[in-house]
């Protein structure tokens, strides 16, 4: 009887699953035990599994190990972090868009690394915008400044990617694919295929895959949080996803930091401890969510 081994699901092929063995790195095409269908058990890219290899070089997945998280659209399990790629022109990423991405990452309990990309294209006015963004976010999230063209920041970014499952996020055109090519040129063909796949239309159903970095770690081939949808968040829950709000003392324990008196968050905004843009974006999202609930 073959001994069970452990691996990670990296892709699907019809009703078969490709598993990468955690010790050898070998990729095994596996089928699922009947119990998955009978018990309606789901399996996703990123799942860590136990499988039994057979004499033909294939295998059978026996169990899915503990899943720490599950992202949707696309479904990917056990993601460690979001690499949020931001540009200040071509296209410009507003602080509102940045904060929406960050809310989704916080809701999913994911670490975030902010990447200011296309640094080689910026003039002095653009660099001023970069410095303003740094002032807002540098105490909240790690920031890496990059250029796929010059190689700036690529080695630093690799250190964040090493040994983790990452998903890239950011507006279309910020250079996610180009960054991946610069980080790991061996991904180039696959990344270009993914770019074409994504451009076929937002309603195209795609199955995510994990692309492996030569230096260790994986990246999901489909950007995370592509539709920036926050409608499943309750208005009263939103404050939990602005990390700098957490230690502020308010008179009311259930303060939403909007129109309540004696609010520690509003006081912190007035004192310059919390960036005005962060607070304004919070209030805008709060009323958006409140409006949807009333419909």
Swiss-Prot record:
<keyword id="KW-0699">rRNA-binding</keyword>
<dbReference type="InterPro" id="IPR030378">
    <property type="entry name" value="G_CP_dom"/>
</dbReference>
<dbReference type="GO" id="GO:0046872">
    <property type="term" value="F:metal ion binding"/>
</dbReference>
<feature type="domain" description="CP-type G">
    <location>
        <begin position="68"/>
        <end position="228"/>
    </location>
</feature>
<dbReference type="InterPro" id="IPR027417">
    <property type="entry name" value="P-loop_NTPase"/>
</dbReference>
<comment type="function">
    <text>One of several proteins that assist in the late maturation steps of the functional core of the 30S ribosomal subunit. Helps release RbfA from mature subunits. May play a role in the assembly of ribosomal proteins into the subunit. Circularly permuted GTPase that catalyzes slow GTP hydrolysis, GTPase activity is stimulated by the 30S ribosomal subunit.</text>
</comment>
<dbReference type="InterPro" id="IPR010914">
    <property type="entry name" value="RsgA_GTPase_dom"/>
</dbReference>
<keyword id="KW-0862">Zinc</keyword>
<dbReference type="Pfam" id="PF16745">
    <property type="entry name" value="RsgA_N"/>
</dbReference>
<keyword id="KW-0963">Cytoplasm</keyword>
<protein>
    <recommendedName>
        <fullName>Small ribosomal subunit biogenesis GTPase RsgA</fullName>
        <ecNumber>3.6.1.-</ecNumber>
    </recommendedName>
</protein>
<feature type="binding site">
    <location>
        <position position="257"/>
    </location>
    <ligand>
        <name>Zn(2+)</name>
    </ligand>
</feature>
<keyword id="KW-0378">Hydrolase</keyword>
<keyword id="KW-0342">GTP-binding</keyword>
<feature type="binding site">
    <location>
        <begin position="170"/>
        <end position="178"/>
    </location>
    <ligand>
        <name>GTP</name>
    </ligand>
</feature>
<feature type="binding site">
    <location>
        <position position="250"/>
    </location>
    <ligand>
        <name>Zn(2+)</name>
    </ligand>
</feature>
<feature type="binding site">
    <location>
        <position position="263"/>
    </location>
    <ligand>
        <name>Zn(2+)</name>
    </ligand>
</feature>
<keyword id="KW-0694">RNA-binding</keyword>
<keyword id="KW-0690">Ribosome biogenesis</keyword>
<comment type="subunit">
    <text>Monomer. Associates with 30S ribosomal subunit, binds 16S rRNA.</text>
</comment>
<dbReference type="InterPro" id="IPR031944">
    <property type="entry name" value="RsgA_N"/>
</dbReference>
<dbReference type="GO" id="GO:0019843">
    <property type="term" value="F:rRNA binding"/>
</dbReference>
<feature type="binding site">
    <location>
        <position position="255"/>
    </location>
    <ligand>
        <name>Zn(2+)</name>
    </ligand>
</feature>
<dbReference type="GO" id="GO:0003924">
    <property type="term" value="F:GTPase activity"/>
</dbReference>
<dbReference type="InterPro" id="IPR004881">
    <property type="entry name" value="Ribosome_biogen_GTPase_RsgA"/>
</dbReference>
<dbReference type="GO" id="GO:0005525">
    <property type="term" value="F:GTP binding"/>
</dbReference>
<keyword id="KW-0547">Nucleotide-binding</keyword>
<feature type="binding site">
    <location>
        <begin position="117"/>
        <end position="120"/>
    </location>
    <ligand>
        <name>GTP</name>
    </ligand>
</feature>
<dbReference type="GO" id="GO:0042274">
    <property type="term" value="P:ribosomal small subunit biogenesis"/>
</dbReference>
<dbReference type="Pfam" id="PF03193">
    <property type="entry name" value="RsgA_GTPase"/>
</dbReference>
<comment type="similarity">
    <text>Belongs to the TRAFAC class YlqF/YawG GTPase family. RsgA subfamily.</text>
</comment>
<dbReference type="GO" id="GO:0005737">
    <property type="term" value="C:cytoplasm"/>
</dbReference>
<keyword id="KW-0479">Metal-binding</keyword>
<dbReference type="InterPro" id="IPR012340">
    <property type="entry name" value="NA-bd_OB-fold"/>
</dbReference>
């Amino acid at each position: 009887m073959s001994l069970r081994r452990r691996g990670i699901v990296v892709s699907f092929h019809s009703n078969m699953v490709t598993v990468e063995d955690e010790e050898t790195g070998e990729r095994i095409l596996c089928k699922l035990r009947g119990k998955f269908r009978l018990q309606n058990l789901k399996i996703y890219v990123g799942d860590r599994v136990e499988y039994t290899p057979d004499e033909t070089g294939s295998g059978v997945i026996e169990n899915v190990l503990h899943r720490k998280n599950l992202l949707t659209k696309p479904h990917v399990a056990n993601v460690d972090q979001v690499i949020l790629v931001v540009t200040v022109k071509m296209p410009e990423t507003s602080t509102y868009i940045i904060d929406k991405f960050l809310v989704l990452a916080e809701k999913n309990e994911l670490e975030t690394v902010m990447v200011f990309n296309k640094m080689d294209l910026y003039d002095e006015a653009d660099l001023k915008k970069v410095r303003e963004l740094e002032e807002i976010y540098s105490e909240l999230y790690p920031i890496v400044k990059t250029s796929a063209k010059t190689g700036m920041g690529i080695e630093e970014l690799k250190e964040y990617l090493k040994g983790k499952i990452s998903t890239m996020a950011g507006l279309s055109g910020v250079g996610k694919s180009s960054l991946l090519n610069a980080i790991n040129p061996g991904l180039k063909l696959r990344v270009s295929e993914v770019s074409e796949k994504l451009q076929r239309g937002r309603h195209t159903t795609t199955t995510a895959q994990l692309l492996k970095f030569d230096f260790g770690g994986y990246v999901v081939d489909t950007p995370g949080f592509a539709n920036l949808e926050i409608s499943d968040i309750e208005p009263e829950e939103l404050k939990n996803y602005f990390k700098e709000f957490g230690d502020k003392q308010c008179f009311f324990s259930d303060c939403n930091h909007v129109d309540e008196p004696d609010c520690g968050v509003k006081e912190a905004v007035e004192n310059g401890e919390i960036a005005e843009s962060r607070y304004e974006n919070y209030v805008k999202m709060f009323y958006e969510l409140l409006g949807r609930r009333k419909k």
